[in-house]
Swiss-Prot record:
<keyword id="KW-0804">Transcription</keyword>
<comment type="similarity">
    <text>Belongs to the RNA polymerase alpha chain family.</text>
</comment>
<dbReference type="GO" id="GO:0000428">
    <property type="term" value="C:DNA-directed RNA polymerase complex"/>
</dbReference>
<dbReference type="GO" id="GO:0003899">
    <property type="term" value="F:DNA-directed RNA polymerase activity"/>
</dbReference>
<keyword id="KW-0808">Transferase</keyword>
<dbReference type="Pfam" id="PF01000">
    <property type="entry name" value="RNA_pol_A_bac"/>
</dbReference>
<dbReference type="GO" id="GO:0006351">
    <property type="term" value="P:DNA-templated transcription"/>
</dbReference>
<dbReference type="GO" id="GO:0003677">
    <property type="term" value="F:DNA binding"/>
</dbReference>
<dbReference type="InterPro" id="IPR011260">
    <property type="entry name" value="RNAP_asu_C"/>
</dbReference>
<comment type="subunit">
    <text>Homodimer. The RNAP catalytic core consists of 2 alpha, 1 beta, 1 beta' and 1 omega subunit. When a sigma factor is associated with the core the holoenzyme is formed, which can initiate transcription.</text>
</comment>
<dbReference type="GO" id="GO:0046983">
    <property type="term" value="F:protein dimerization activity"/>
</dbReference>
<feature type="region of interest" description="Alpha C-terminal domain (alpha-CTD)">
    <location>
        <begin position="251"/>
        <end position="340"/>
    </location>
</feature>
<dbReference type="InterPro" id="IPR011773">
    <property type="entry name" value="DNA-dir_RpoA"/>
</dbReference>
<dbReference type="Pfam" id="PF03118">
    <property type="entry name" value="RNA_pol_A_CTD"/>
</dbReference>
<dbReference type="InterPro" id="IPR011263">
    <property type="entry name" value="DNA-dir_RNA_pol_RpoA/D/Rpb3"/>
</dbReference>
<keyword id="KW-0240">DNA-directed RNA polymerase</keyword>
<feature type="region of interest" description="Alpha N-terminal domain (alpha-NTD)">
    <location>
        <begin position="1"/>
        <end position="236"/>
    </location>
</feature>
Length: 340
């Protein structure tokens, strides 16, 4: 009977997730995942993007109360903008809450001034993430008071669909954007494993409002997908025979060891990575002359690697039959105990 686990174990799996933050801010990151089976880059990228933009918990202002103002079609004495414009500006305020319960923030300023989000008294449990965001223009000797209710939620909730029931007279519900992720884009490129060059590389660009770091947002989105998909697994996994038959291989199992598991200097490791040398089998097929032609790879790096290969009774310039095997990642996992 065909092993059920072969359905997922035989597939190529990503080696790691690489995060690269942009120098101007920690709220933007480039995330690279490789290698993936062909088609999986688009599948995972689209699923992650949808979850990131719709399902993460965040905080937002859900209602406001301005003395003597009962609805959004009013005007505020001394304020250049009408109430609907002020509400639109308030929707752009990004907040972070350190508690799950709702909090009420206070705003009290006297003109003339440009009123910004940083002037709001948030207390200890709420943090304004964009304090320079403009709320309105206040005229000279005029005063503006406002109470702003902040809550935790997810997604985008219209004021007409607000879960705020029985708001007091004069308190105005506003549209609330809870999602801490501002934008997600992705693209899929080809990447190489051994001699095969048509695997997928998923590259995602994630920007948050500062409530979460992009790395955390991606991790939470992956966990949400994991929880949702778990229900579809409706079978019991079979016990696999853990006996590894090393004599079935036409080459040494040490060739299946990944070069990033070797204790190499950073310079040597980067040279191998840039030259797409993944496994020791890829490495020993190269000659010393081949290696010295690799950019930034010198005699010192060559001698370092020769010493490590000698520990496994291996050398450069070896003739390895049937390399690379089609199921190289599965073999590497199966024979892991043999070379560790």
């Amino acid at each position: 009977m065909l092993s059920l686990s072969k359905n997922w174990n035989a597939l190529i799996k990503p080696n790691k997730v690489a995060y690269e933050n942009f120098p101007e801010t920690n709220n933007k990151a480039k995330i690279v995942v490789e290698p993936l089976e062909r088609g999986f880059g688009l599948t995972l990228g689209n699923a992650m993007r949808r979850v990131l933009l719709s399902s993460l918990q965040g905080a937002a202002i859900t209602s406001i109360k301005i003395p003597a103002i009962e609805h959004e079609f009013s005007s505020i004495p001394g304020v250049k903008e009408d109430v609907s414009e002020v509400i639109l500006n308030i929707k752009g305020i990004e907040v972070k809450m350190h508690v799950a319960e709702k909090r009420i923030m206070k705003l009290k300023v006297t003109g003339p001034c440009v009123v910004t989000a940083g002037m709001i008294d948030t207390g200890h449990d709420v943090e304004i993430l964009n304090p320079d965001h403009v709320i309105c223009d206040l005229a000279k000797d005029k005063q503006l008071e406002m109470a702003l209710t902040c809550k935790v939620g997810k997604g985008y909730v219209l004021s007409t669909n607000s879960y705020e029931d029985n708001l007091p007279i004069g308190e105005i519900a506003i549209d609330a954007l809870f999602n801490p992720v501002k934008s997600v884009t992705y693209k899929v490129e080809n990447t190489r494993v051994g001699q095969v060059t048509d695997y997928d590389k998923l590259i995602m660009f994630v920007e948050t409002n500062g409530d979460l770091l992009p790395e955390m947002a991606v991790g939470l989105a992956a966990r949400i997908l994991q929880e949702q998909l778990q229900l579809f697994i409706s079978f019991e996994e079979q016990e696999e025979d853990k006996q590894v038959k090393t004599d079935a291989l036409p080459f040494s199992p040490y060739l299946l060891k990944r070069v990033d598991e070797l204790e190499l200097s950073v310079r040597s490791a980067n040279c191998l990575k840039n030259d797409n040398i993944i496994y020791i089998g890829d490495l020993v097929k190269r000659t010393e002359s081949d290696m010295l032609r690799t950019p930034n790879f010198g005699r010192k790096s060559l001698n370092e690697i020769k010493e490590i290969l000698a520990k496994f009774n291996l050398r450069f310039g070896m003739d390895v039959p049937d390399w690379p095997p089609e199921n190289i990642q599965e073999l590497s996992k199966r024979y892991e105990d043999s070379y560790n």
